[in-house]
């Protein structure tokens, strides 16, 4: 049954009228899935989450005792933050994850529809399931902030903020009013996650939450902040700027033969000299001498040869294996962002999200006015906040795609090496290190996923073959980052000197894993021992159990969606299809969706028919570890889950190989006229190189708008 746009508009106007009264209820934000394009084509309705969306006014009501005696800032008058919440249909999660994209000024709908949310968007602007969605591990809330970002609005435009302190205050106002509307969420464990410039937002917001908890009256529930999750974060501008040239040399992006290489060296030296001259009372957030290095690096790596395609002129700063047009150099990437824009411009979508189409701006990924205003004349970089947060007991996970240039691994590891917290500087001699594998239970395959380093509440995860947007490249693998925090991984403890191994999988929900494991243990107790002699029966052992597992695996195969590979498929087809996107009619779109569904059914059927017996899988897994990692025959999976708080490994348990970040390993550093300190951490890139596949250059379609300035962080 179709709902007219006029009726939707009327409903939305009534909704907005309620906003000003402070009487909003949870039911006012319910999203009807059938009003969103593409949802009706999803055959497995269990993949469609509960959804809530809309504007939450920052001045909805004063909810703290302290605010009752303070004048409300005019800047928050008629200011509304847009949020979109996703909740699993059948799993009641104890976790609530707030996701923030960076910029500053970039919409968190990137996270919702390109990275970690339950849906991706195809080239026709229609939703389809994201197999690696994080909503199976916790409720997800994506927020467009600060003012001027995405679908958030303010009547006081251009009332843009210039300091992270103000941005943090507004976030607390949002949380107060969010928890007024969703009071049960205050009982959940809160995780604040995000990427890029969210490396500034998240620590500042965490500090603001701690201060808020201290101020509120005893009869009010505190916000139970448990963990911060920062992907490819921009946290320490000075240290990270100094990482650009050494990292580019390490990855063979530049060298002595690069034109204007000497200019790069001088720029690096100029940045270092500026830092050396900074006084202790200097309040600068960043320095132009250092920020200019990335622009210069992009400039000297341009390919101006006559035969080069216009969309392959310069390096993509978010994935150095890719190319882009100049001066975008990554701003046109990923192509899926254009699909998101098409989704939000589809008639009826804005109204379905409980917004008034006449009052919200046309959605765009990033607002550069927000970026230009947020200069932080008062606040200092968030790296200064990390020690206090770590010492307060909050877990912090920093995860990085290893192919990112703008917020690269070296910058993060150098920052950690200088950080002092919980009685030591950098990772201590009690640091725990792991190799990380991802196991696809559907395809019965494994692949190296990255490395994990943990010490004193801080975890650093390097993700193999991933970009600045880890969950975009490695959707289902990236969900393993949450599984590592939730102890939802297998641990293989090794008796050799190499690190232990963590294994994450594509199990759809955490509860499914626990239920399957418990059922297996019960069946083992029931069928594994015969009456009378107490010995196992080879003929009867596990018959019913194996049958049940086979049926479950078949069900999982049918439920699993192949959409995790969509980014590569879309990118491969974009050059041919983009010109036709606007001409596609509804019937063609529906046919495409039906064809895709049929193909997925065939793939699922084929995989189901060739499914390996569960016990054979375990045997193959153990053989793999024995052959590849040198595990002794007596060694097995010693525990199903692991905890970082277990007894630390000894320092001689790790590889002593030198780091590629060490300048002594650079082929082109003989003539350098500056010193770069050795990276104190072992290499995160020296494992599984034979198994890693380097991407080919992927061209961005030439018809994409090239009017962007050099991509922001």
Curated annotation (Swiss-Prot):
Keywords: Apoptosis, Carboxypeptidase, Glycoprotein, Golgi apparatus, Hydrolase, Membrane, Protease, Signal, Transmembrane, Transmembrane helix. GO terms for cellular component: membrane; trans-Golgi network. Residues 651-667 have a biased composition (Low complexity). Belongs to the peptidase S10 family. The keyword Signal applies. Residues 23-616 are lumenal. Residues 523-552, 602-612 have a biased composition (Basic and acidic residues). This is Pheromone-processing carboxypeptidase KEX1. It is a single-pass type I membrane protein. Residues 638-713 are cytoplasmic. InterPro entries: AB_hydrolase_fold, Peptidase_S10, Ser_caboxypep_ser_AS. Residues 512-522, 553-601, 668-678 have a biased composition (Acidic residues). GO terms for biological process: apoptotic process; proteolysis. It comes from the Eukaryota. Residues 1-22 form the signal peptide. Glycans are attached at residues 457, 465. The chain crosses the membrane at residues 617-637. One of its GO terms (molecular function) is serine-type carboxypeptidase activity. The gene is KEX1. Residues 500-612, 650-696 are annotated as: Disordered. It is found in: Golgi apparatus, trans-Golgi network membrane. Pfam families: Peptidase_S10. It comes from Vanderwaltozyma polyspora (strain ATCC 22028 / DSM 70294 / BCRC 21397 / CBS 2163 / NBRC 10782 / NRRL Y-8283 / UCD 57-17). The active site is at 196, 404, 468. Protease with a carboxypeptidase B-like function involved in the C-terminal processing of the lysine and arginine residues from protein precursors. Promotes cell fusion and is involved in the programmed cell death. Its EC number is 3.4.16.6. It catalyses: Preferential release of a C-terminal arginine or lysine residue.
